[in-house]
Every structure is written in structure tokens, then in C-alpha cells.
Amino acid sequence: MYPTLNLAVCLKSSHLISSHRFCLKNSQSTEKHQKEINISVKERYTCNPSHRQKKNGWVREKNALREPLTASLKFTIHLNSIVFRYIPLYAIIMVGNPVLRPVDMKMQPAPYQDRVRVVQKIYTQLKRFQSSSPHIIKASTIWEHEVAKIAKTRQSYAFNASILLRDIVKYKGNLDKTGKPKNNSSSLIQRSHVLQKLRSLLLDEETLSRNGFFVKMYDTDPINESESDYVECYRCETKFDVTKIMEPTVCRYHLQRKVYNRETKKREFPCCGASLESYSDISAGCMKAKNHVYKWENFTKLSSVVPFKSLVDIKGEENVLALDCEMAFTSKGYEMIRITIVDFWSSEVVYDKVIKPLGEIIDLNSKFSGIHHIDDTAPTIHEAEKCYICPSMINQNSILIGHGLDNDLRVMRIVHDKVIDTAVLYPAGKYKSSLKNLSFEILSRRIQGGEHDSSEDAIAAMDVIKKKLSIPLDKKSW
């Protein structure tokens, strides 16, 4: 009784994928007895007529995978009740998994062995969700080829392959011919249904307040003249006289806030690796500046620089906008220096301006903002808001989408209650997820690789919401 196995024949030289065993009967042997043969990656079996009497004519060859077999001895393979007769010996016979070969390419982004492994992994994952073996084999090679075509380096190939394998599991193999998730047809394609779903995602007043949003126009307390002029530096936490903010000093700080390292079990600064327990100079700060900076959080303090505006009196039709701002430290605190607004329905940027701050510039935060220079002709916040706070753009009926929108609305000096904040919708435990991580996890998109781009961030936050509502990201007509 022969074991039940799958058998595939490849007429060209190929890598042998894994170790298998099968029973083989040499039809030219007078003894007609069966012989069990092992085939592994580093060895194969050929039949050499000159050695027919030795080991029944079978000779093991090592490390010769790419050389074609030239012997012409014919043989018969009995496998269960199926008989394969008169197979030329140059054929490589494999059993177990089918032959999985990547599509040949002139310029391969990764070594051939890596591509073979990826095809195998795709096939293995697809078998969990689909039963049609020929379809799975074809899909595995096609999807791997799609990954290889867009990859420029070995690293990008591995990254894109991991995304594909993740999507196969996430969508249970329900991907299109390019390896992308299939768009589910639903009523969400209708604009009215999309609006209904978007309204269900709006944050309530309690959630807004808990996450730092100003939910109404608060009464501003009169500024106490006897109040101390000393404030805490936002970067190094040193107390300093805000009236002397432009006077040169030494501000040592870390570019990134400390986080807990699970391996070292210490709170460390990811910008330089220094920990709170270290006593080196770098532990005090890996960056040095000539001025301290501050950031008002109080409604009254913020209003003393630029008054807030409520959108209650700004009439207009209901629209959906995604926005993001870039900020800088100035002598007047934390000010907006760029604003980008994107239309949800068309995915087009409808407003994008560099804003001239009211205070004297101390730090443009160029590493994060991407702004290195602001021209004197750039509009101020008072001039710019006449363009973006209007019936045709941001009005009382606008649904605003963004990530960490409390910061954006604060520097824009806007009080609004129709807000969808991806930082709140997708928390990371007791903390908020970064837009960079959200974009990677949900959109399989890498952003903020270097300097931030407000248009890139606004579109990413918008696409996260579209993905949540199963809206095709390329849909621009409604």
C-alpha cells in the first residue's frame, strides 16, 4: 500500500523546496523491487545507466541543483493507484508541496531563494482560507510578482511581502489579482450614508473636554498684573522670565520625550538612548538651544495672544474636511506656521498656506514641521482665517477630521464641536497612538520618514477614517 502524496513534475532544472519521501519502482531492474528515496534541498537522485547495477541504478548527487540531468533511462513510478510511465530522467520529481517558482525577472529586488520562501509563505497562508489548489498556486506566484515589481531594494521587498502576508490573514485571502483587499460593495458608497456614518464617529462633549478640546467660548479672566512672569520652559523644564525670552541663554533638552524601554526596564529618551539613571552630560539633554520656549494651555492666556472664534455664527452647507497644522515656538508662545485643509470627497488639497507668526521666531521645529524659512509676504493668522473660516470652507456644519486635533484647533483659535479625531478613536492603551503607527497598521503606508508634511498627515488621518468606513481610497466621484 503506497502512501497518498501529491506529485508534480518540472521539466526544467529547479530548486528543490523541501525534504520528501516517495516510493519508486525501477522498470528496467530485473529484480523489480521498490526503493524508498529521500529528496532534500541539497541533494537529488539521478539514474545513470553505467551504474545500473549499483544501488539499482540510482546515484545520489549533491550540490548540483542548477545542472540539468542528462541520463535518458526511463522508469515507472507507482504512487497509490496512479502510474506514471516513461518519464525522461531529466525531469525533477517532487512530492508534497507543489512546485512554487517565482516569475522570472530581469532585475530581481531580492535573491531568488528569498523570493521562493515568500511564494511558499503566501501559499501556506492561502491554504488556510481557500481549497482550490491550482488557484492558490497561481495566486501565490502572481501576488509575489506584484510585490517584487514595486520593490527597489531587498529591504523594501521584505517589507512589502510582510504587508501582503498580513493582509492575507486579515482579509482571509479575499484579495484582488494585485494582492490588494477587495472593495466590499455597500451602501457606504452613497454620499448620504457616508455622512450618516461620519456623524456617528463625532466625539461627544465629554470626550472632547477630556482630550483637551475647548468645547465652548469660556469667559476670559482678567490678567492679574501681580502674577509672576516666570514660566516653565517647554523643552528643558527650567523656570525662566518670559519677558526676557529673547535674551540668550542655554537650553539643554531632548528632542523626543522619554519612553519606557521594556528590555532595559528603564525610561529612556529615544532620540539619544540616554536614561534618567545615567549621569552623563547627554542625560541632561542631547540638544542645545540659545533660548527657552513656552506653550500656553490656558484659554485666557491663549486668548490674550489671539482671540478664539466660535463657528456657531458661520453659516454654510455641511462638508467634511481633514486638516493638519505645523507649529513653531516664538516670543508669543506656540504659533501656527502652516495649515493644510483637504476635502474628504475629492481627496484634494483645498487650502495650504505657510503662516507668518505674530511673535519673533525662536524655533521653527524644522525637523518636524518641514518649514525652514517664512517669507515676510506670508499671511498672518488674522489674514489667513478670512480664507478658511467662511461658508464655503470651515463653517458651523463642517465635520473636521485630524489626528490630535485639539492642538490644531488651539493654534487656529477655533472652538468647534463636530470633530473626528483618529488619536482618540484609536487609543494605544492609556496613551494615544501616533499617526505614523496608525498609517502603517491600517493603511500599510509609511509617513513621517523625515520631516513632517501637513498635507501628508491630513490625508493619512482622512484615509484612516475612509478605511474604517470601507470607502475605497481612490474614490473621488460621488
From Swiss-Prot:
Gene Ontology CC annotations of this record: cytoplasm; nucleus
Membrane-spanning residues: none
SMART domains, sorted: EXOIII
Keywords: Cytoplasm, Exonuclease, Hydrolase, Nuclease, Nucleus, rRNA processing
InterPro entries named among the record's database cross-references: Exonuclease_RNaseT/DNA_pol3 (IPR013520), REX1-like_exo (IPR034922), REXO1/3/4-like (IPR047021), RNaseH-like_sf (IPR012337), RNaseH_sf (IPR036397)
Chief site of localization: cytoplasm
GO biological process, one term: rRNA processing
EC numbers: 3.1.-.-
Superkingdom of this protein's organism: Eukaryota
A molecular-function term among this protein's GO annotations: nucleic acid binding
Residue span, Exonuclease domain: 320-465
Keyword RNA-binding: no
Subcellular location: Cytoplasm; Nucleus
Leader sequence residues: none
Family to which the UniProt record says this protein belongs: Belongs to the REXO1/REXO3 family.
Function comment: 3' to 5' exoribonuclease required for proper 3' end maturation of MRP RNA and of the U5L snRNA.
Protein name: RNA exonuclease 3
Source organism of the structure: Kluyveromyces lactis (strain ATCC 8585 / CBS 2359 / DSM 70799 / NBRC 1267 / NRRL Y-1140 / WM37)
Annotated gene: REX3
